[in-house]
């Protein structure tokens, strides 16, 4: 007998859907997002970057009478302004709409969905799940500051290596094909301002921290070693080194 999968449901009230419509909407987004819209699907995970490869936001994109790009409220205007720079060349209409969004966690994988559902978890719970899943949704403070490797995203989930050029593609390709990575993402269940190695030297780069449901987390981009704080060894609650040592 097969066991049923546990599904967690999260009510997400702090998200916006940006609609992109027009006969050339696909062509516009093909040059802006990291996924490949030539792969016919009704849902895409995508990253939008600037020309220097800094991540403007991650997103969930739905195909339904145009394209619905779901992002956090606080980065919605930023992404809209970026897309509108190019929309005049593609005869597209771009608007922002508030629609019901919820999230699901199933078999350790997270996905946003459109619609109303009676969920027993909220946006704060979602933030924690995303933090531990290395898939945190970009907020205003993070937008345009970090590159994709510093955020710990699964590149296979967000990026197509078969499509042609898109904004930030050259930098992403360079980060991907540099060879063996010397730094990856680790997450601690405490808000550390800095971490040290066994020689008491400050190491790594703090990317962001999260306080939610009376819990603290911190996310660092750092080499694979033993980590210390105030002379005591500290253990990450999740990290890329264990998830994929060959990444």
Predicted regions and their residues:
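Short amphipathic beta-strand starts and helix->beta connectors
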Residues: 1-6, 44-58, 200-207
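Acidic, low-complexity central loop/insert segments
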Residues: 4-21, 40, 57-137, 239
